[in-house]
Amino acid sequence: MTEVKLDFDKQGGLVPVIVTDYKTGQVLMLAYMNEVSYQLTLETKQMHYWSRSRNELWHKGATSGHFQHVKSIKTDCDWDTLLIAVEQEGAACHTGAYSCFFTDIYDDNQDR
């Protein structure tokens, strides 16, 4: 594992995390991590976030059983955003949908 120093200072102590399905590449959700949730994720290989609405640490799946198991972690060129591929148990979205991104606003590829 490559050691990097993520830039948590740029966005008030948080970094955005884009979470994808490691098999399909489908985007599952966007969440945020602080340094503590990032370290917990590295240590446990399960996703931990910072809940901005509840203002607390959030271990994904601890309540719902819908755990996310880390398969790979990448950072962007500025070291202030993460892209994490996971093995998803159940739904990623609190609505029960597999992905949080299920509402089409525009899709020019309707004939796919």
Swiss-Prot record:
One of its GO terms (biological process) is L-histidine biosynthetic process. GO terms for cellular component: cytoplasm. It comes from Streptococcus thermophilus (strain ATCC BAA-491 / LMD-9). Binds 1 Mg(2+) ion per subunit. It is found in: Cytoplasm. Homodimer. It catalyses: 1-(5-phospho-beta-D-ribosyl)-5'-AMP + H2O = 1-(5-phospho-beta-D-ribosyl)-5-[(5-phospho-beta-D-ribosylamino)methylideneamino]imidazole-4-carboxamide. Keywords: Amino-acid biosynthesis, Cytoplasm, Histidine biosynthesis, Hydrolase, Magnesium, Metal-binding, Zinc. This is Phosphoribosyl-AMP cyclohydrolase. The gene is hisI. Belongs to the PRA-CH family. Transmembrane segments: none annotated. GO terms for molecular function: magnesium ion binding; phosphoribosyl-AMP cyclohydrolase activity; zinc ion binding. Its cofactor is Mg(2+); Zn(2+).
